[in-house]
Amino acid sequence: MSLYSETPSAALLPSGFADLLPGEAEAEARGIASVMEAFSRHGYQRVRPPLLEFETSLLGGSGESLAPQTFRLMDPNSHRMMALRPDMTTQIARIASIRLQDAPRPLRLSYSGSCIVVGTPGREADRQISQAGIELIGPDSAQADAEVIALGAKALAELGIEGVSFDLSMPALALGLIEGVIPEADREPLLHALDRKDASAVAELGGPIAGMLAVMLRAAGPADRALDLLASLDYPKDVVGYFERLAASVAAIRERSPDLRLTIDPVDFRGWRYHTGLCVTVFSTSSREELGRGGRYLAGQEPACGLTLRPQALLRAAPVSASRPRCYVPVDLDAASLSGLHKAGYATVSALSHDEDAAAQARHLRCTHVWKDGAARPL
């Protein structure tokens, strides 16, 4: 009996889900391994949270913001509702605040794995996504922000991704201004206008802070120019600290990575539901899609900063790497020769019988080399 149905419909997968075939799957695995090795070299220890958790655990606290993107199902054993993670950050926060509460701080953790998101009806997008990231838990400082961003930049550089840009934002800066003077009932239209970068609507809805918000709109762009414009504003005492932290974080990043391209969007609020300070989105000139995002948040009651990269997006942005050469070898090749091929970087494909025409079989199996006269010979 076949392990799967051989009807034509067997190849049909739900929208947003896809098989990764050998070349793609291997490239993604190599990319994740490269990123995780970069994190490990800098002291970030790997953890592996489960794909499923009880709904009350996964979506409690700041995880509540993930509810609209979460698949749910009933546990047939406990009859409790469970949820498939749409993001791993809240799981890392749980591990840090409960399982590793006695571990020394700063706590540096890394992770990788698959997530499942509900997606947006009518839009074609991945609903099974890969994540690989780091979280720095304990310190609340510009240097901690800079460490996370600089390490993310190093990981991308090792993949050969060029034209990388880190777009910084500080949602609390504009939100602090708005909450101080704009009635709650009038805030949503103003936030929507800022999100659309609609200067005329902001001027109409901004009331006494319309001028400051207009400067913030104009400030979006290269970090140095943005900071110069933002520094010209007269902030209330309870808001000025957000600007000072943004400037300090940029300076700390520059110190670690002088050549890193930084931009600032002071009125970017999209997707920063549980973040409390500096936020970052990663882009590249070689791709139109977002490569990753992160920022500052609370892990339980502790300050934390993290960055989550999207390996599938990284794969599309990175240059195509040469695949491992494949050598077709005889069924009875000795162990020493096999070991030598593996150390030289070859994948070996073994014959299952004594072939009359090894070269023909090697080509059939898409090998690049064949074992002949005691060595790997190119086909």
Swiss-Prot record:
InterPro entries: aa-tRNA-synth_II/BPL/LPL (IPR045864), HisRS-like_core (IPR041715), HisRS/HisZ (IPR004516), HisZ (IPR004517)
Recorded metabolic or biological pathway in which this protein acts: Amino-acid biosynthesis; L-histidine biosynthesis; L-histidine from 5-phospho-alpha-D-ribose 1-diphosphate: step 1/9
GO MF annotation, one: histidine-tRNA ligase activity
Keyword entries, A-Z: Amino-acid biosynthesis, Cytoplasm, Histidine biosynthesis
Superkingdom of this protein's organism: Bacteria
Quaternary organization: Heteromultimer composed of HisG and HisZ subunits.
Protein's name in the database: ATP phosphoribosyltransferase regulatory subunit
Organism, scientific name: Gluconobacter oxydans (strain 621H)
